[in-house]
Amino acid sequence: MAIADVTIIPIGTETPSVSAYVADVQKILEGYQAEGKIKYQLTPMNTLIEGELSDLFAVIQAIHEAPFQKGLHRVATNIRIDDRRDKKTTLESKIESVNKHLQP
């Protein structure tokens, strides 16, 4: 299972706020999560998505398209993928691994 760190950057918006665009992306992600294809977590600066690599690419394409559906003509998307294949990793397991090292 892979984990993607994705930031969608709508360019040319009428206001500096992008929360409406973020909400649109979250709605798309909720649909994929309801289908059992991904898990995701919104953070203040990006969205983390966990799933099979092929599903991640499909999801990323769908959320990249969302601002265009609102009439924008330019979108920049930053993607970082952690695809570890020697063992199963999840969003939670990565945090648990760090927390183990923090225990006295």
Curated annotation (Swiss-Prot):
Its name, as the record gives it, is UPF0045 protein YqgV
* Native species: Bacillus subtilis (strain 168)
| Pfam families according to UniProt | Thiamine_BP
Query: What Gene3D superfamilies is this protein classified in?
Result: 3.30.70.930
The source's superkingdom equals Bacteria
Similarity-based family:
Belongs to the UPF0045 family.
> Per its UniProt record, what InterPro entries does this chain match?
MTH1187/YkoF-like, Thiamine_BP, UPF0045_domain
